[in-house]
Amino acid sequence: MTALTRFAHSRSSWFLLTGTAIGLEAAALYFQYVMKLDPCVMCIYQRLAVFGILVAGLIGMTAPKYRLIRILGASCWAVSATWGLKLALALVNMQNNPSPFATCSFLPEFPTWMPLHEWFPAVMLPTGMCTDLPWRFMDVTMAEWMVVVFSTFLVIWLLFIVPILSGSTKPSLYK
């Protein structure tokens, strides 16, 4: 078993994924409440995608020695990172090519059975506009940084998918 496979089968790899997502969620709340940067609806959707990566890490952390658990975690990771990248690219396009006809909505379009913006308004209620560019770091906007973040999550997923899918050297039906 290679070192990468051993790491993918360990709790620490999934803990690292979870910790990274928690750090990103904490940074989002810092930007919102300390720096007073209002999140737009696309930002809220990206926040939800990061939460999906957090859930993926928690799934993988429960029992990383079992292939089925690793596959469930990796699937959630891939879907969330892909969806987040799609949203981040759409937001970058919206900010780089502003149009009065192509704006984002004021309220998120969550399912009626799961109105997260009503249940958790402090975290999931958008208060900003998608075309606002209030913050830059190294001349890169927050939306562009999120493209980097979600792309990195996907590249790491690509590096880990084969070790995640591989079984352990111990004979077992589930490993």
From Swiss-Prot:
Q: Name one GO biological process term.
A: protein folding
* Residue intervals on the Periplasmic side: 31-48, 90-144
Instruction: State its location(s).
Output: Cell inner membrane
InterPro entries, from UniProt?
DiS_bond_form_DsbB/BdbC, Disulphide_bond_form_DsbB, DsbB, DsbB-like_sf
Where's it mainly located? membrane
A single Pfam family, by name? DsbB
What terms describe the molecular function in GO for this protein?
Answer: electron transfer activity; protein-disulfide reductase activity
Instruction: State which residue ranges cross the membrane.
Output: 14-30, 49-64, 72-89, 145-163
Q: Which GO terms describe its cellular component?
A: plasma membrane
Going by the UniProt record, its keywords in alphabetical order are: Cell inner membrane, Cell membrane, Chaperone, Disulfide bond, Electron transport, Membrane, Oxidoreductase, Redox-active center, Transmembrane, Transmembrane helix, Transport
Q: Which residues lie on this side of the membrane: Cytoplasmic?
A: 1-13, 65-71, 164-175
Bilayer topology annotation: Multi-pass membrane protein
Q: Cell membrane among the record's keywords? A: yes
The record's family statement is:
Belongs to the DsbB family.
Q: What does this protein do?
A: Required for disulfide bond formation in some periplasmic proteins. Acts by oxidizing the DsbA protein.
Q: What is this protein called?
A: Disulfide bond formation protein B
Q: Which species is this UniProt entry from?
A: Shewanella sp. (strain W3-18-1)
- The record's gene field reads dsbB
